Amino acid sequence: VVADVTYVNGVETERTILSSVTLKEPVTEQRLQGTKERPTWLPTGTFRWPISGRITSRFGGRSSPGGIGSTNHQGIDIAGPYGTPVYAADGGTVTYSGWMGGYGYLVEINHGNGYVTRYGHNSSLTVSVGDHVYKGQQIARVGSTGNSTGNHCHFEVRYNGVARNPLNYLP
């Protein structure tokens, strides 16, 4: 910055900017520093398995449940006993918790940066829209609601609204 500054008796009375150069455009960002603890519900950037169990249906093309026709499966199905706790794959904000047609009882969590996870066919839900959840927090219980042929957790990972193969994100 080049400026013409006028002083009267040692006190600045006028300043006129003659020219300025921006060396680098400012970037809006959140910086974590100091000793303040990070909220537990903030996403960690990695996902965990929502339940332990055997994968009974993979991502992509498959025969429709009931054996008639075919569908493009938007997630994976993980078998589990009725009532088994379902856990959040990462921290975030619950954006849906309720009945959603073929999904049955569904929980949807927004993890930020374009990532959303869905957990379907639950027997019961333990979170509500607007809740902040942490990675590993119980959010539902395994069931067979909606278009389902047995107890399992349907797990989806979506990036910018597009379903992705969850196995590419799980350890």
Which residues does each predicted region cover?
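Catalytic cores of peptidoglycan-degrading enzymes
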Residues: 41-171
